[in-house]
């Protein structure tokens, strides 16, 4: 399936996932993993015992001198905040985009993921690793889960 490389279209899709901390992120993780696979990456969903997951996508030859880009898929709750529009619908007002997570951190996820099809993935001489975690907003729980299972699932990563 060919997906739209437009980062704004992907951001709209990502913002629509209500990935409030402590809630499942499996749907957004599946979209991001699929995009990475379509771009030539080897992906893994690293699931935790509470039904959460992290996404790991690797491109290029395995190495310890490549680069890791890391981000999180969860957002802070919207309860008690004065939103003038649905926080889980991306809207444009006066040339700016508004939606929960558009700046922290779904905008970054959309930008990186949308750029993947334009990268010369098969020409990489060093590894590029994308790590998208869950529950960063509430104590970096996804990162802790990743660290606990690092050697078992990831092996050496770029330093």
Where are the regions a protein language model picked out?
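Acidic/His- and Gly-rich active-site-bordering loop/insert found
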Residues: 1-102, 118-125
């Amino acid at each position: 399936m060919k997906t739209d490389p437009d980062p704004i279209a992907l951001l709209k899709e990502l913002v629509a996932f209500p990935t409030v901390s402590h809630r499942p992120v499996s749907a957004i993780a599946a979209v991001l993993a699929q995009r990475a696979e379509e771009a030539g990456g080897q992906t893994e969903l690293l699931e935790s015992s509470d039904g959460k997951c992290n996404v790991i996508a690797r491109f290029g030859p395995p190495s310890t001198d490549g680069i890791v880009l890391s981000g999180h898929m969860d957002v802070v709750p919207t309860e008690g905040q004065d939103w003038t529009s649905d926080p889980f619908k991306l809207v444009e007002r006066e040339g700016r985009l508004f939606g929960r997570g558009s700046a922290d951190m779904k905008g970054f996820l959309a930008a990186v993921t949308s750029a993947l099809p334009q990268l010369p993935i098969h020409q990489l001489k060093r590894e590029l690793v994308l790590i998208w975690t869950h529950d960063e907003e509430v104590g970096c729980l996804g990162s802790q889960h990743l660290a606990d299972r690092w050697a078992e699932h990831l092996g050496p990563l770029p330093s």
